């Protein structure tokens, strides 16, 4: 029998995660936990003597939750982990559940440059740091000084930019880690110019990406050698290809869409079909950028 640690935060059993994801698919969390604060999270982790499986969940923007749901405890950091504050004139500390868009807007309002690209990346600061998210010529590695995190044993840890070991859409951090905060360097700029750049990015996204659809962002990371995943998918003749209720976007081939009745299986099957056909057509193995978690039905 599952015995849950005593916490200040909130537990929910058999919790429907579908409505929290951008794809609007997937099964339930066996246990859903929103900690009250970082000390509450640490207390939960230290009391987890049964070693219940732990899954972390962010904004649900770049993820497929499989139809069988998630075993164990799914942890989502709430509003208390979303603050943005100045440490000093040269550094910001940002909670990991803060949305990228909100940080971009804060920086524009405070004439801080270098964060404009975040307006075009759905998701949270924690998720972006974990995968070194990037767009429009910038990545998280360019702006992060260090992160503060907690491991699954409840130990608080700090990692500098160098220790994080940022790579293209990945890093060298331990797997059993929950990012709590990120510290960023501040470079002053002109508020009007920053806003212009953000508006340019938003206009480009609206023109080239299916942002009004049920999608999960870029499906595959771009392969090495300057190749673009969408070009390889298009070359393989897969623009608009459909499996069940899921399809490859007509507007941008590296996006999958839930047309309204897709299952998680439809989306994952479509992604795997695309990978197989691109490899047969071009000899290139595409790597998933979208995270797939949970059980198959």
Swiss-Prot record:
GO terms for cellular component: cytosol. It catalyses: UDP-N-acetyl-alpha-D-muramate + NADP(+) = UDP-N-acetyl-3-O-(1-carboxyvinyl)-alpha-D-glucosamine + NADPH + H(+). The keyword Disulfide bond does not apply. Its main location: cytoplasm. The active site is at residues 169, 218, 289. It holds the Pfam family FAD_binding_4. It comes from the Bacteria. One of its GO terms (biological process) is cell wall organization. Residues 24-189 form the FAD-binding PCMH-type domain. It is found in: Cytoplasm. It is an enzyme of class 1 (oxidoreductase). Its EC number is 1.3.1.98. Pathway: Cell wall biogenesis; peptidoglycan biosynthesis. Keywords: Cell cycle, Cell division, Cell shape, Cell wall biogenesis/degradation, Cytoplasm, FAD, Flavoprotein, NADP, Oxidoreductase, Peptidoglycan synthesis. Its cofactor is FAD. InterPro entries: FAD-bd_PCMH, FAD-bd_PCMH-like_sf, FAD-bd_PCMH_sub1, FAD-bd_PCMH_sub2, MurB, MurB_C, MurB_C_sf, Oxid_FAD_bind_N. GO terms for molecular function: FAD binding; UDP-N-acetylmuramate dehydrogenase activity. Cell wall formation. NCBIfam families: murB, PRK13905.1. HAMAP family: MurB. Belongs to the MurB family. This is UDP-N-acetylenolpyruvoylglucosamine reductase. It comes from Rickettsia canadensis (strain McKiel). The gene is murB.
């Amino acid at each position: 029998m599952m015995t849950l640690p005593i916490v200040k935060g909130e537990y929910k059993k058999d919790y429907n995660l579908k409505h929290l994801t951008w794809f609007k698919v997937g099964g339930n969390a066996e246990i859903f936990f929103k900690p009250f604060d970082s000390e509450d999270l640490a207390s939960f982790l230290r009391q987890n003597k049964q070693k219940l499986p732990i899954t972390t969940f962010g904004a649900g923007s770049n993820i497929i939750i499989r139809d069988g749901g998630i075993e164990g405890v799914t942890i989502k950091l709430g509003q208390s982990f979303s603050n943005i504050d100045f440490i000093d004139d040269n550094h910001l500390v940002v909670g990991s559940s803060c949305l990228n868009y909100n940080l971009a807007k804060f920086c524009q309002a405070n004439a801080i440059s270098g964060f404009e690209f975040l307006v075009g990346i759905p998701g949270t600061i924690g998720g972006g740091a974990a995968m070194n998210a990037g767009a429009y010529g910038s990545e998280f590695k360019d702006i992060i000084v260090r992160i503060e995190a907690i491991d699954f044993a409840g130990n608080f840890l700090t990692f500098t930019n160098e220790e994080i070991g940022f790579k293209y859409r990945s890093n060298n951090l331990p797997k059993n880690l929950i990012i709590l905060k990120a510290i960023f360097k501040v470079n002053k700029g002109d508020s009007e110019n920053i806003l212009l750049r953000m508006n340019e990015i938003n206009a480009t996204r609206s023109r080239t990406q299916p942002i009004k659809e049920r999608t999960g962002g870029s499906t595959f990371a771009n392969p090495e050698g300057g190749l673009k995943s969408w070009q390889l998918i298009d070359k393989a003749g897969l623009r608009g290809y459909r499996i069940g209720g899921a399809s490859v976007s007509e507007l941008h081939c590296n996006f999958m869409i839930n047309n309204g009745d897709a299952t998680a299986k439809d989306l994952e099957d479509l992604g795997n079909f695309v990978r197989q056909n691109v490899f047969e057509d071009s000899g290139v193995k595409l790597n998933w950028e979208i995270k797939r978690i949970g059980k198959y039905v």
